[in-house]
Amino acid sequence: MAINIRKTHPLLKIMNHALVDLPAPSNISLWWNFGSHLGLCLIIQILTGLFLAMHYTADISMAFSSVVHICRDVNYGWLIRNIHANGASLFFICVYLHIARGLYYGSYLYKETWNIGVILLFLLMATAFVGYVLPWGQMSFWGATVITNLLSAFPYIGDMLVQWIWGGFSVDNATLTRFFAFHFLLPFLILALTVIHLLFLHETGSNNPLGINSDADKISFHPYFSYKDLLGFFVMIFFLAALALFMPNLLGDAENFIPANPLVTPPHIKPEWYFLFAYAILRSIPNKLGGVLALLFSIFILMLVPLLHTSKQRSTIFRPMTQILFWFLVANSIILTWIGGQPVEQPFIMVGQIASISYFSLFLIIMPFTSWWENKILSLN
């Protein structure tokens, strides 16, 4: 009998167990595609970022003009830049859908996989933030100033911490240089953590829409799900191409076409759309330290979800009350995203505060209590 090299070669064997002969539940739906989409997004971002880094200059006197140079003088530089900028938006769309899938179907009960995923989200947000500073436009500069300034809210060490991150007494050349270094380095850390994320996932196997053990009904990943993922790739690339070629500035801020000027503050300082929900939570608390802690907790609250799972069932597919609350959470997050982009005035302040309270209440009180109540109704206690 011929020896199959993919099953015997030390390196190919690992790839084989992860991508070819991986036993997968036969009933996983379209929502399970987003993990591979994120892998593709990461590869696209690293490759386009690498080519941009070849032409970019991390110096405050040249950063803005080097981005202009990339768009005007470098062969297909405009395309690489547009794909990289809009690829970040697509990355976050896929991440949020991936997290929503995990919350809906109870995938968070794979605690190690889930917690590494939350750390990955935090690193992704850090990478996107430092990357947004690099073009050195108005919103880049003021966004960096406002967000890094939040660290001064920490008692005693706050001011020292801010100056340490800035590398001086204001956002300046040292800040831009180190942010470029971080923006180059962090994606590779994300790549390494992604491998660990997959390692833990393959220890348990994938969850499925029913949230039940699927050991009795597994099929091989290739060709069934590899082709399913491939279809998803084509759809995703189509949307990315449409965005990058026809509407490259749709999700950006016009303010960033103005070179950074420390003497002129933009009328509304706001981050990219994918941070607006957390920014709205930050702004809805009058106290500075309280706002910073709420901002951090809005992400790290995801780590508490496995501990707050009170239901006897895993998935929400047979739990209509929790399903309704899940969609409340989705709607609430969309409202927070909208509020984050609005000026700080009534009625936006009040709506933001109500949405922020609702966001934390749904996670910490309402959903766990409803799950417990559903157990009682279904006599599952």
Curated annotation (Swiss-Prot):
Family annotation (InterPro entries): Cyt_b/b6_C (IPR005798), Cyt_b/b6_C_sf (IPR036150), Cyt_b/b6_N (IPR005797), Cytb/b6-like_sf (IPR027387), Cytochrome_b (IPR030689), Cytochrome_b_C_euk/bac (IPR048260), Cytochrome_b_N_euk/bac (IPR048259), Di-haem_cyt_TM (IPR016174)
Disulfide pattern: none
Molecular functions per Gene Ontology: metal ion binding; ubiquinol-cytochrome-c reductase activity
Pfam families: Cytochrom_B_C, Cytochrome_B
Binding residues for heme b b562: 84, 183
SUPFAM superfamilies in alphabetical order: a domain/subunit of cytochrome bc1 complex (Ubiquinol-cytochrome c reductase), Transmembrane di-heme cytochromes
Biological process annotations from GO: mitochondrial electron transport, ubiquinol to cytochrome c
Keyword Metal-binding: yes
Miscellaneous: Heme 1 (or BL or b562) is low-potential and absorbs at about 562 nm, and heme 2 (or BH or b566) is high-potential and absorbs at about 566 nm.
Protein name (record): Cytochrome b
Originating organism: Carcharhinus porosus (Smalltail shark)
Gene transcribed to yield this protein: mt-cyb
